């Protein structure tokens, strides 16, 4: 990254300005001297070039006073290896661990695959007929004496349920926020919303409490949200109907029939032209033209053309959170929204699994009502004509598939069952071997014709929901093909020009500046992203420059009034990176992935335009908020607490890699840098930076209490299980 010697005028967004050679930190109330200390002590890259000690590539430049002897926090495996395996897992963790993954590969050395998380359950569960009813007036249990659950509430509380948590002030965070707890007597903080009342016969009856004032305050802010503040909830009846193929997909069926017929005709047509040896036979040429006209006549326009779909907007003030498997769960997305993230995506869902009605896959579509609110955009934003911010929302779905019918049918089902989606994004960047071998994810980069068919079909059946796509530079380092692919996605390929059906109609393209082969071994190539951004700008603004006028796109097939938005993705770790990419790469917005997992307040930094040196106390407060959001999502009963703990530990396996700004010798920080052994400014900061998973468990116990005796957690990499000596 080039040093900045003075404040440069912003060509795109005056709001995001690069620093004038000085490190900037937040002036937090807890540490009023932080900003002054960072400005006076930290060395910028400009000062390095003026004679200060050089910054070592790949090593986090920690100040000498915070370094410790290697033996104190040594790790048997290089930190970079740990990070690479974890970063790959963030893209498709549970697909990576499916059966069929090849074993014994050298690059998998040190990884814990097929991890076992144990279980967190009551010794004996409470019957659902008793869980929410007053002690002496329960609902009738349809299993009667054969029921395997406990029917006596007091016996359950005394003998089968672990003691209540003492965290959160002893008050259930769900009840505190909503005035009611949907987990009843099974809640691990039930004593905060349970009491005894005297009955007419002199007995003491246990009852659950509700707070009407809290319930009024907690009413959903989005009209179509559930009582719990969630959107895109698919009922069990709908999922069963999908699984049993009782839910029809008429638009997909019609499109796929046309696609099959057209593909065969085109194949025959193109094959015949090759045999003509230069096309000397005019009769054959005329016949080919007639066939093309027949194909055009047979094409039935979809009910919603790309130009008629809901308009969207991406801009410098709308940073997006990348789709993240495992890490991109609902509690984490809520946390990012709280810190200024404007767009979120579901975890990657497999199209075939959605078609089969798998509950786990449909559960990925759930979103919090905060994600269903319109994004905050600038009053001077250059929005496309027809864009209505009040109808926009923040949450989109991402799917993957290896066959056109997988993606197309899944899209129609999503549009029908989960209509509260900003976009449906097709994943063409997942590098995981299992996904790649099946022909999905980044494998589609080498099959542009198939990819175009998938996107065109998705557009034909998604109704008002726009279609977007996320790609990589290519599958191999030495042969990037994103420029050719982008041109095809914006203008349409040769087949579409023969049929005169225009481009596939994607509303936005996101490019991750790495190849599939590269993974995270090198930094993202933002110069290539800039090249692609310039190409899209030319295609958006100067359609007349397209030399092949036959391929000039049909305006009816163009989304967003003819503009295809372009987002860059890769290694954004601070507002400095974000501003640099906006101003120098020419992207409309930046999608943040690993940077947000490691420090969710990166969105806050982007909004403020300065570094924020969050104290250990502030960072721990984020962990507490995550715990509350986790209990709200997965439950405050024993099982929910265990699930929250598991996903919190997965998140902490990334957050420990954050080195506080105040400890760095040079700025800006680089996400690829790996730190030597270091200690924090206090014990809590040191604990938050520990690479030992047992310390991560200690952090979860601050809010979730001691782990269940049957709970297990294996870190993604064996080195994180290493116990430091001394």
Swiss-Prot record:
Origin organism lineage: Eukaryota, Fungi, Dikarya, Ascomycota, Pezizomycotina
Assigned EC number: 1.3.1.89, 1.3.1.-
Keywords, comma-separated and alphabetical: Cytoplasm, Flavoprotein, FMN, Metal-binding, mRNA processing, NAD, NADP, Nucleus, Oxidoreductase, Repeat, tRNA processing, Zinc, Zinc-finger
Segments of skewed composition (Basic and acidic residues): 28-38, 94-103, 113-124
Single GO cellular component term: cytoplasm
Cell compartment(s), UniProt: Cytoplasm; Nucleus
PROSITE patterns from the UniProt entry: UPF0034, ZF_C3H1
Gene Ontology molecular-function annotations: flavin adenine dinucleotide binding; mRNA dihydrouridine synthase activity; RNA binding; tRNA-dihydrouridine47 synthase activity; zinc ion binding
Cofactor: FMN
Domain of life: Eukaryota
Pfam families xrefs: Dus
Family classification: Belongs to the Dus family. Dus3 subfamily.
Protein name per UniProt: tRNA-dihydrouridine(47) synthase [NAD(P)(+)]
Primary location: cytoplasm
Physiological role: Catalyzes the synthesis of dihydrouridine, a modified base found in the D-loop of most tRNAs. Specifically modifies U47 in cytoplasmic tRNAs. Catalyzes the synthesis of dihydrouridine in some mRNAs, thereby affecting their translation.
Spans annotated as Disordered: 24-56, 68-124
Catalytic activity: 5,6-dihydrouridine(47) in tRNA + NAD(+) = uridine(47) in tRNA + NADH + H(+); 5,6-dihydrouridine(47) in tRNA + NADP(+) = uridine(47) in tRNA + NADPH + H(+); a 5,6-dihydrouridine in mRNA + NAD(+) = a uridine in mRNA + NADH + H(+); a 5,6-dihydrouridine in mRNA + NADP(+) = a uridine in mRNA + NADPH + H(+)
InterPro entries in UniProt: Aldolase_TIM, DUS-like_FMN-bd, tRNA_hU_synthase_CS, Znf_CCCH
Gene Ontology biological-process entries: mRNA processing
Catalytic residues in the record: 430 (proton donor)
Source organism: Neosartorya fischeri (strain ATCC 1020 / DSM 3700 / CBS 544.65 / FGSC A1164 / JCM 1740 / NRRL 181 / WB 181)
Record carries keyword Zinc-finger: yes
Binding-site residues for FMN, renumbered to this chain: 323-325, 398, 470, 512, 569-571, 593-594
